[in-house]
Amino acid sequence: LGRYSVDQPLYPRSGSNVSMSLQFTAPYSLFGNKDYENMASSDKFKWIEYHKYRFTAEWYQRIKGNLILKLASKHGYLAYYNAKLQSPFERFQVGGDGLSGFTIYGRDIIAQRGYEIYSNNDGATIFNKYQAELRYPFSLNPSSTIYGLAFFEAGNAWDNFKSFNPFQLRRSV
């Protein structure tokens, strides 16, 4: 579900991009009486089950001329139908530059400049990321759009709501 009102895809000057995605799998563990605590991992994760929620909001505003302010907020939450079946797949990894453009081992990589991708090796089930950028174009040629930017990012990932602290953020400038 989303709303996209950005004026240009390569160098947005105004508009917003707001989206929410939901992913659900069937709750296989509810269909049988199995002892998941003593089960081998290969049997336990034969059928992965989870429900995953992501929210992204980006706003673009022209300050003066081609100087643009971008504000963004991203959030994610991964939950399980059965607490004994917390899969190592589909988790969130916060860090890296975001240039890889793909998911490794069923994990969503949430780019945050200045931090390594695997600073949280097991992945996390909750993440928040906030971003502010000032952008100025050097070339608006559609075949080679080039712009400089100054940015501020803050974000983190947590394993559960007990450890979740929205004010404990890793920052980069």
Description of each model-found segment:
Residues 5-6, 15:
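Intrinsically disordered, low-complexity linker/loop segments enriched in Gly/Pro
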Residues 10-12:
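Extracytoplasmic assembly/pore-lining segments of large envelope/extracellular complexes
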Residues 14-173:
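C-terminal transmembrane beta-barrel domains of outer membrane proteins
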